[in-house]
């Protein structure tokens, strides 16, 4: 059966480290937590990634180029525990796509699979313990991270040929990476990190989704199903998107989605009603994340 745990994270890691919390002990062991029931095989698309470096010192903040080529504004000396500001993205037109990014997505990049034996060994060991083997491959988030949250919406109108080229390149590299894993292990779950919705619904129309995403998603899912070492094993296809998702569920069902998360309460997702409409859809989440920031005692309301 599919297993999923909502991870609410840790609120005081920085303070605990200052108070001599061991940093060489896995957190699950340190806090006596249950082990995760899934094992993640990385969907590392860029090889080589961009060199991460500080571009500008802004006093309390620092502007950093991350491994995906984005310019990100962080609090100085901190990378986790808050939402940074994304200032710039690597793809602005066809020239920047081809010169800065596309060559990094070449399936034949030297050294891309140097660590495959180690990754496969870990995955096989996890599978032998009954863990779900998950591959996170991105999707809408992939192209949004390349172009930018707002600019990608204009790109569908202004640069449709470029968008198709970017998505076709995504299919080739994802297909190659997952296929290499599937030579050795059966994949239990494809995880699409989307965040394609906001509080009121999807960022793009149904027609746009069908033109720029659905056929590529269907191609990837079809290929994974056909290559499974264990053809009788259920392939879970999970779509993760914040925002209100009721309008996109039928679209994602067309590409084979059978798991969805996190059904944000703040975006008026009614998990009871949606569960009635889609009784065979595995639904994860439905937790009001705002509770944890009201009062510390509010955590017990969850």
Give the location of each predicted region.
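Active-site loop segments of alpha/beta catalytic cores
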Residues: 1-11, 15-18, 65, 94, ...
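Short, surface-exposed linear segments at secondary-structure transitions and domain or protein termini
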Residues: 80-91
